[in-house]
Amino acid sequence: MDIVLGIRVEDCTLVATSKAATRGISVLKDTDDKTRQLNSHNLMAYSGEAGDTVQFAEYIQANTQLYTMRENDTELSPKATASFVRNQLATSIRSRKPYQVNVLLAGYDTNTGKPSLNWIDYLGTQVELPYAAHGYAGFYCTSLLDKHYKKGMNFEDGLDLLKKCIKELETRMPIDFKGCYIKVVDKEGIKLVE
């Protein structure tokens, strides 16, 4: 029942994730953050099997931080981070116990000054998109994003569109997902909006 949404706009990337951690029909926690800060300009939002998501997220977070330490505080770019995550999932799918994790990777490339949003699924498929979703958000919000997304949108426009998507999910989903955390990745780093 995870909800993961992302929108890339002109100056940043916005990500929304549901707060509810569920098991079957039970809500176990209503403050679950389904994102991990990989470095100062890369944020990973994830959905999937409960144990797999946390273990995979911690593994990716630790390895990107290890890279930064080894390379004299040089951080991986969003493109390099997406390639690393994709490779780990593609390698995992060929093992006896693959990770059942889907990822949205939001980033801001400080060298080019451009935001990015990468959609990566548990099979290791990766594509850079202007907007993306995993979980039930994909079923309910893709048409809304298709209709209202415009090239050249700014932060406020993107936030309004994300709120429209969340309102649509609240209206149409039969389960209460306890609201969403909204985070933004821009030239200044990663911030919690709501």
From Swiss-Prot:
Coiled coil region boundaries: none
GO CC field: cytoplasm; nucleus; proteasome core complex, beta-subunit complex
Compartments in which it is found: Cytoplasm; Nucleus
Keyword Cytoplasm in annotation: yes
Organism superkingdom: Eukaryota
GO biological process, one term: proteasome-mediated ubiquitin-dependent protein catabolic process
Transmembrane regions listed in the UniProt entry: none
Keyword annotations: Cytoplasm, Nucleus, Proteasome
Matching SUPFAM superfamilies: N-terminal nucleophile aminohydrolases (Ntn hydrolases)
Cited Gene3D superfamilies: Glutamine Phosphoribosylpyrophosphate, subunit 1, domain 1
Summary of the function given for this chain in its UniProt record: Non-catalytic component of the proteasome, a multicatalytic proteinase complex which is characterized by its ability to cleave peptides with Arg, Phe, Tyr, Leu, and Glu adjacent to the leaving group at neutral or slightly basic pH. The proteasome has an ATP-dependent proteolytic activity.
Family affiliation: Belongs to the peptidase T1B family.
Assembly with partners or alone: The 26S proteasome consists of a 20S proteasome core and two 19S regulatory subunits. The 20S proteasome core is composed of 28 subunits that are arranged in four stacked rings, resulting in a barrel-shaped structure. The two end rings are each formed by seven alpha subunits, and the two central rings are each formed by seven beta subunits. The catalytic chamber with the active sites is on the inside of the barrel.
Protein name as catalogued: Probable proteasome subunit beta type-4
Organism, scientific name: Meyerozyma guilliermondii (strain ATCC 6260 / CBS 566 / DSM 6381 / JCM 1539 / NBRC 10279 / NRRL Y-324) (Yeast)
